[in-house]
C-alpha cells in the first residue's frame, strides 16, 4: 500500500479488519474502477448497506453489475474525479478518523514464530532491505494478498500486480519489463508462489540473458494455496488438484539457469541469504 495516513488497506475477504469496518459503516462509498467482485462483496445484498454508493467506471457494463449502486457515472476516472473535486467541500471528519484509528489498533497482527518463516516476516524483511523506493511485483495467489497487505512503498507505480485478473505467471514478465524500463540500478523484487512460478519459470532464461538483477522470492507451500483456501471455505473441503505434491528444488532450478538460489525455513536463514 502507498504510505499515506488515509490509506487503510484492501477490502474484502483478503482485506483487513479496518478497511472492511470502514466500508460497512460508511455513509458514502465512492468506488473508482472497482467491479465489486466476489472477493470484495461476498454478499452483494449486505455490502455497504448503510452507504450511498457512487460507482465510477469507463466501462458502462460494470456499473451496478454485482452491487446495486445509487449513482453510476460512466467516464475516465481522472476526468470524472477532477470534475467532482470543485463540488466537494473540505471536511476533516475527526470523529470518523478517530474511529478508524481505534479499529486499526484492534486489527489483526500476525504472530511471529522463530522456528518457521512467516509471510509477513519475509515481506517486512524485504521491504526493510530494499526500501520504499523499490518496485515490487507479484504473481497471483496467497502471496499476492500478503504482499498487498504488508508492502509499504512511496514510488509511483511501485507496486505492480494484476489484481483480480488471476493471471498466474504474470510476475516474471512484469518484473523483467520494470527492470528493462527503469534500468539495472533500480531495485526490482518479485514475490511469487510455487504455483505461479511454475507457470512462467522459463523467463528466468530471459532475465539471465539480459543480466537483470531481479530478486525473486518464492513462497513455496507445494500447493495452489488460494484455490485450496476456497475449497476449504466454500466447498466443504472437497479438494481437487490442490493436494500438496510439488517437490521442485528451486535452488537447483535457479542454479540451472545460472542464478543464485537459497532455501530458507526461518527468519534467520532468510536474513542471512538476503
What residue ranges belong to the model's regions?
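Active-site diphosphate/adenylate-binding microenvironment
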Residues: 3, 101-183
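Glycine-rich, acidic loop regions that bind phosphate or pyrophosphate groups
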Residues: 5-99
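Thiamine diphosphate
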Residues: 7, 14, 20, 25, ...
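Structural signal for hydrophobic packing residues in well-ordered secondary-structure cores
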Residues: 27, 33-36, 81-92, 104-108, ...
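Receiver (REC) domain switch-region micro-motif
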Residues: 29, 136, 188
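Short beta-strand segments
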Residues: 31-33, 57, 139, 191-192, ...
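Flexible, glycine/proline-enriched loop segments at strand-loop-helix junctions
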Residues: 71-72, 109-114, 262
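Short, basic/glycine-rich phosphate-binding loops at helix/coil junctions
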Residues: 96-105, 252-254
Amino acid at each position: 500500500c502507498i504510505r499515506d495516513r488515509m490509506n487503510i488497506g484492501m477490502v474484502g475477504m483478503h482485506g483487513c479488519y479496518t478497511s472492511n469496518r470502514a466500508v460497512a459503516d460508511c455513509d458514502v462509498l465512492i468506488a473508482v474502477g472497482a467491479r465489486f467482485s466476489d472477493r470484495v462483496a461476498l454478499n452483494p445484498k449486505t455490502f455497504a448497506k448503510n452507504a450511498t454508493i457512487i460507482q465510477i467506471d469507463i466501462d458502462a457494463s460494470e456499473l451496478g453489475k454485482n452491487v446495486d449502486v445509487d449513482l453510476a457515472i460512466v467516464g475516465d476516472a481522472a476526468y470524472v474525479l477532477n470534475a467532482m473535486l470543485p463540488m466537494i467541500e473540505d471536511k476533516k471528519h475527526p470523529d470518523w478518523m478517530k474511529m478508524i484509528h481505534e479499529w486499526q489498533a484492534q486489527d489483526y497482527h500476525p504472530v511471529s514464530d522463530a522456528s518457521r518463516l512467516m509471510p509477513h516476516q519475509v515481506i517486512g524483511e524485504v521491504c526493510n532491505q530494499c526500501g520504499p523506493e523499490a518496485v515490487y511485483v507479484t504473481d497471483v495467489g496467497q502471496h499476492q494478498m500478503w504482499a498487498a497487505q504488508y508492502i509499504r512503498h512511496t514510488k509511483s507505480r511501485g507496486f505492480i500486480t494484476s489484481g483480480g485478473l488471476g493471471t498466474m505467471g504474470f510476475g516474471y514478465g512484469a518484473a523483467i519489463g520494470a527492470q528493462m524500463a527503469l534500468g539495472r540500478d533500480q531495485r526490482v523484487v518479485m514475490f511469487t508462489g510455487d504455483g505461479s512460478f511454475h507457470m512462467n519459470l522459463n523467463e528466468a532464461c530471459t532475465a539471465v540473458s539480459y543480466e537483470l538483477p531481479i530478486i525473486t522470492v518464492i513462497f513455496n507451500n507445494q500447493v495452489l494455496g488460494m484455490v485450496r483456501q476456497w475449497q476449504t471455505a466454500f466447498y466443504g473441503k472437497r479438494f481437487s488438484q490442490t493436494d500438496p505434491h510439488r517437490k521442485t528444488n528451486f535452488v537447483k532450478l535457479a542454479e540451472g539457469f545460472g542464478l543464485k538460489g537459497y532455501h530458507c525455513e526461518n527468519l534467520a536463514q532468510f536474513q542471512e541469504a538476503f
